[in-house]
Amino acid sequence: EIAGLIGPNGAGKTTVFNLLTSVYQPTHGTILLDGKDIHGMSTAQINHAGIARTFQNIRLFSNLTVEENITVAMGPQIKYGLASSILHLPPYRWEERVAHERAMELLSIFHMEDMANAQAGSLPYGAQRRLEILRALATNPSLLLLDEPAAGMNPSETAELTDNILAIRDTFKIAVLLIEHDMNLVMNICEGIAVLNFGKLI
């Protein structure tokens, strides 16, 4: 399912995302993910539990390649030890190959395979946005939070993003919650919409 969270600036939309990802801790109440209380978990534990997100302002490792930006998100899933890493033993080589194949698989969703070796900071704005989404997907989430994914995009890039988000839902069978001010995008892809104002649902 794709759901939208809309409302005016300052309504508390990003605060909701920050609460869901444990950037902020709620003063009372509980936060449930698949029936499990995730209140009090660290951001790493939240990610391990199945929540991944993007940000209003793009956060990439600009000096790393596109592929490296994706594989770095797979770190918690990698199972080789320090010795294997230093000596490049078979477990290291196998895990690195798996990470490479997974990164290329993700890049193929957005038709970005030919950008794998490009420096992330050199990508066009729209491609950087898509890369941030792919990096979040690399953590294998069950819930993907997209914070204004179309911000700064031109109509052509927004149309492409719309197709990308639908492809994510259909390919990964995950829930997507997005904050967005582009009402055309919201109306075109969201199956449910919640409106937030002054921190309250209306």
Language-model-detected regions and their locations in the chain:
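Glycine-rich phosphate-binding loops of nucleotide-dependent enzymes
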Residues: 1-202
